[in-house]
């Protein structure tokens, strides 16, 4: 494969994400564009390969012991940061402590809350002690926020854009672009083929699709399903689809009235015509969601929970029981996902038949992720999903994660859910583990604040001038957001 790959050239990527409020801090990265930037200049301890398999990135070998409570990670030797510093255990420990710190605003803080101690085994070995065993621990360390940064004087500089990755960051303009040149010292000779890379934010779907059709960029993500057949007619363009765990949600915050009311949440969950959304918004490029962020692509998916259907009578019953009257605001933008505004309007129309009045408020695309999502009571969102239930729950649903965008805390069900997530992680009997994850999904499905109507395929378009390996990762868009590292010009 890489034997035939051409070296050189300038790659230009167009992302439908990015905001003027973005920063280079990996801990606050919240969209595909900044993730693409971090993965161009940096490396993680582990990552999902394009085969779907979890492999060591900066880790050469690892071993769990003591009931998966103790983990020893042996780092690759001779890996250099772009400033010439050799990677060692201090860099790993200091980076992770930056995310774990008391005042940390990192989205990965909750993921790492199970770590009780990190220490140096040797210059190239890091030892982790967990408060309870977790057989999935290496998966958590592949979270895209955990780009390893160089330590200096016991600290890291999260805004430096300094890493060990295939490209050296030259410039970054938030919500506009990042530019890179090849790292001649990259530790993987079979990756990082381009001389230069440019990653652009192109929020407008039509402009983004035109950019790849006109040859201004080489690849774009988030192709609108409505345009797939038109773009396929272009002889110079390939459409690439991957099916994974990406899903679209409408999170209701339990810390904001009226969403603190169980019956109101249930009324809204029953007011959604999911199949209509899959048909009209995804045009079939996806599958039904059932208000749980776990699907058949993941282990321990609870397929015994009946598919939640549109039920106007039950929706009206729960709405009346909630005691609510008046309009319910739903703040959305197509920044969340292509067709989010249309999806919200379809939900408003189907809810009206149950006597529920939803006011769809269209928000600006720029700043949506910092001003609306995780702040307003009800909005639209997308998640790339995660390969295991443990990781997905810790990313968005446990009490201590910054990204618990439904603020699902404090209810009896949420307390039980948090207990189950901790217990399931350290459970070595897979049948018992399955029972715990199944119950956790039932609690979330019933009491949680998420409306998750659909799982969406990743759809990207690229020029036929680009070549790639037979497998393309489905854990994120753009080949796991490592297109710049893995692809080459044919």
Task: Indicate residue ranges for each PLM-predicted region.
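N-terminal lobe/hinge region of extracytoplasmic solute-binding protein
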Residues: 14-66, 97, 162-163
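Gly/Pro-rich hinge or "lid" segments in bacterial periplasmic/extracellular proteins
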Residues: 49-53, 142-192, 196, 313, ...
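Surface-exposed binding/hinge segments that line
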Residues: 74, 108-151
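Aromatic- and charge-enriched surface segment that lines or borders ligand/interaction sites
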Residues: 60-105, 121, 127, 211, ...
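Short, low-complexity disordered leader/linker segments with a strong preference
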Residues: 1-9, 101, 117, 309, ...
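Alpha-helical secondary-structure segments
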Residues: 12, 87-97, 123-129, 165-166, ...
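Detector for C-terminal structural segments
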Residues: 173, 272-300, 336-348, 369-490
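Ligand-site clamp/hinge motif
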Residues: 185-230, 349, 357
């Amino acid at each position: 494969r890489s034997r035939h790959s051409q070296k050189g050239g300038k790659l230009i990527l167009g992302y439908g994400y990015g905001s003027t409020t973005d920063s280079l801090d990996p801990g606050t990265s919240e969209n595909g564009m900044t993730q693409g930037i971090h993965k161009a200049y940096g490396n993680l301890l582990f990552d999902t390969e394009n085969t779907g398999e979890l492999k060591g990135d900066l880790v050469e070998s690892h071993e769990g012991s003591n009931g998966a409570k103790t983990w020893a990670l042996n780092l690759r030797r001779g890996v250099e940061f772009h400033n010439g510093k050799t990677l060692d255990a201090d860099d790993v420990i200091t980076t992770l402590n930056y995310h774990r710190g008391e005042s940390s605003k990192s989205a990965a803080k909750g993921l790492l809350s199970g770590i009780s101690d990190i220490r140096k085994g040797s210059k190239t070995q890091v030892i982790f002690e967990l408060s309870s065993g977790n057989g999935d621990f290496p998966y958590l360390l592949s979270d895209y926020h955990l780009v390893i940064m160089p330590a200096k004087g016991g600290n890291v500089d999260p805004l430096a854009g300094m890493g060990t990755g295939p490209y050296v960051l030259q410039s970054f303009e938030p919500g506009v672009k990042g530019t890179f040149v090849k790292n001649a010292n990259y530790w993987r000779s079979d990756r990082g083929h381009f001389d230069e890379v440019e990653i652009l934010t192109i929020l407008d779907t039509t402009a983004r699709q035109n950019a790849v059709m006109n040859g201004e960029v080489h690849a774009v993500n988030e192709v609108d399903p409505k345009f797939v057949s038109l773009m396929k007619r272009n002889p110079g363009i390939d459409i690439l689809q991957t099916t994974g765990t990406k899903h679209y949600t409408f999170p209701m915050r339990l810390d904001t009235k009226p969403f603190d009311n169980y019956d109101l949440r249930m009324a809204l969950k029953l007011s959604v015509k999911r199949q209509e959304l899959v048909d009209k918004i995804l045009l079939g490029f996806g599958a039904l969601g059932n208000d749980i962020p776990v699907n058949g692509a993941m282990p321990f998916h609870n397929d015994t929970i009946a598919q939640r259907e549109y039920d106007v009578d039950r929706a009206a019953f729960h709405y009346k029981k909630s005691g609510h009257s008046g309009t319910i605001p739903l703040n959305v933008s197509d920044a969340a996902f292509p067709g989010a505004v249309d999806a919200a309007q379809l939900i408003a129309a189907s809810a009206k038949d149950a006597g529920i009045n939803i006011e769809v408020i269209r928000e600006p695309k720029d700043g949506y992720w910092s001003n609306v999502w995780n702040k307003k009571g009800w909005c639209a969102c997308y998640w790339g999903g995660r390969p295991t239930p443990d990781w997905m729950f810790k990313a968005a649903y446990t009490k201590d994660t910054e990204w618990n965008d439904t603020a699902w805390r404090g209810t009896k069900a949420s307390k039980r859910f948090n207990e189950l997530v901790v217990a399931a992680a350290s459970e070595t009997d897979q049948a018992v583990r399955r029972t715990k994850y199944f119950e956790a999904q039932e609690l979330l499905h019933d009491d949680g604040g998420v409306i998750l109507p659909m799982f969406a395929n990743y759809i990207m378009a690229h020029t036929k001038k680009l070549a790639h390996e037979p497998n393309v990762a489905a854990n994120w868009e753009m080949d796991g957001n490592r297109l710049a590292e893995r692809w080459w010009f044919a």
